[in-house]
Amino acid sequence: MATEISARGRPRAIGQEEYNLYSSLSEDELVQMAIEQSLADKTRGPTTTETTVPTRVNREPAHFYPWTRSSVSPESALTSAPKGLFQEVMQKYNRSKSSQLAPVDPVLKAIKEDDEEALTAMIKAGKNLSEPNKEGWLPLHEAAYYGQLNCLKALHRAYPAVIDQRTLQEETALYLATCRGHVDCLQFLLQAGAEPDISNKSRETPLYKACERKNVEAVRILVQYKADTNHRCNRGWTALHESVARNDLEVMEILVSGGAKVEAKNAYGITPLFVAAQSGQLEALRFLAKYGADINTQASDSASALYEACKNGHEEVVEFLLSQGADANKTNKDGMLPLHIASKKGNYRIVQMLLPVTSRTRVRRSGISPLHLAAERNNDEVLEALLGARFDVNAPLAPERARLYEDRRSSALYFAVVNNNVYATELLLLAGADPNRDVINPLLVAIRHGCLRTMQLLLDHGANIDAYIATHPTAFPATIMFAMKCLSLLKFLMDLGCNGEPCFSCLYGNGPHPPAPPPSNRFNDAPASDKAPSAVQFCEFLSAPEVSRWAGPIIDVLLDYVGNVQLCSRLKEHIDSFEDWAVIKEKAEPPRPLAHLCRLRVRKAIGKYRIKLLDTLPLPGRLIRYLKYENTQ
């Protein structure tokens, strides 16, 4: 094999001739050339290397005798960095030198070539083949690993006492033969008296490995020789667990006939039936149910087989379990039912199967509705199914579950609004969801998102347009606070009846105001526990650096929706800070125009919840438009 090198655009091939040219040099001369080549490469920059290599790298097995591999680097190792001509030659030289020094073990060579005569001759010559190498491997282990039956027999005849001797990984010859699928070697060892239940360091027996490899013949032979079908590995898994995970019915039949317990549990309380349900192995599930396995088995965390099948979306398994009487009202340690997890995963068909058999009382006790989970994951189809089944659309999250969310959300509607899911929001509102139940009103979330469609839906269904945040009190509606950075949005809310009067009811009036608070985000900071938080004044919030530059236009918009008000000294400071805002100060001077005051009086009489009905009043169109602020002249 030749390696193509492209240096400065000149392709070259390193062949046997160039190798011979360099191989005559001494090591000191080669080192000197390496230094010079490295300096030259740095001077002229990188080169482009294209290496032709085989698609698969042939490596010796991990158990290979260490004294025959420790000094040998892999022949076909790939190099990631480009190499110059000299590096390639040096690599070939070093490999050749190493291979010349590597010892060839005659015993291993004889075993790999199945040379029984050579092996027997060595034994007769007095060579001790019962001494392990530093990994604990005997020639017997090698013969079992490579499946060389004749060599195995010869070694056993010479050293019968080592038949069950283990490597440093606690592997016997029987274990190695099973792992490699050498059934003839396995059978010979068992006939010769090998113990079938000796496990490796992971407590995995030959029978366990045979099930893992789906080797039916090996399983049958091991069971015939009384291998323990209920032995547990360090995870508590039995051979039956392993065969169920692979849906190997033939092996399962052999194991159960050989005494395997269908209710054996691993370290996490998981039975073979639980494994079948979890991994969606329907045939294995049917087999275990036929042999009396508990359909309602639960793991250590109380999750049932049905719960796991729902979580992993195994529809046919869920259908079979329910047909066998599986209890759909068993909760896991978190109080979650199969319906909860199916709603969370968005599996419509499984939800439809669970709805008729799920207790509404158990759902209420859980402290969370499937509606919450469907809305949280935007599973609209499942949400429709749950609403069609008349689940309580206003069911709140239990306090301990609400505390898991920073905003202390409670309703399914809140989840839909947070996700900006207009369709789910509409579904929930049409089903009767109350938009005013959460600590933070969903309308405020919609304002933060800037979604007019969601805002309109919430307001049409009774959302409080003057919503406040109880945990962060303000002297003016939080809806105004959230909309300040978008004047068109602020006007939209004011048109729909938001109350702007509190913005001009300052505690300090024309008197001096206290210093502005430090520039920390007080609306994200938790209030001090030793005193109740004070309400934030409008002028205080308007003084925040990110808002103050819009102070004039914000005040201008709000003045269109209030009567005779008094600007406090701080608001006047903001207006005076920019000469073009002087007209706003004049606009605020009382008395306000009579037409404007009449408009406010009419709108107040109608009320904020009926303001959308202005078009139905028996008034001229021009007056209607004036009342709706469509004509501000």
From Swiss-Prot:
Pathway: Protein modification; protein ubiquitination. Monoubiquitinated. Its main location: cytoplasm. The keyword Manganese does not apply. Residues 26-45 form the UIM domain. GO terms for cellular component: stress fiber; Z disc. Residues 579-633 form the SOCS box domain. Keywords: ANK repeat, Cytoplasm, Cytoskeleton, Phosphoprotein, Repeat, Ubl conjugation, Ubl conjugation pathway. The modification Phosphoserine is found at S369. Component of a probable ECS E3 ubiquitin-protein ligase complex which contains CUL5, either RBX1 or RNF7/RBX2, Elongin BC complex (ELOB and ELOC) and ASB2. Interacts with SKP2. Through its interaction with SKP2, likely to bridge the formation of dimeric E3-ubiquitin-protein ligase complexes composed of an ECS complex and an SCF(SKP2) complex. Interacts with JAK2; the interaction targets JAK2 for Notch-mediated proteasomal degradation. Interacts with TCF3/E2A; the interaction is mediated by SKP2 and targets TCF3 for Notch-mediated proteasomal degradation. Interacts with DES. This is Ankyrin repeat and SOCS box protein 2. It comes from Bos taurus (Bovine).
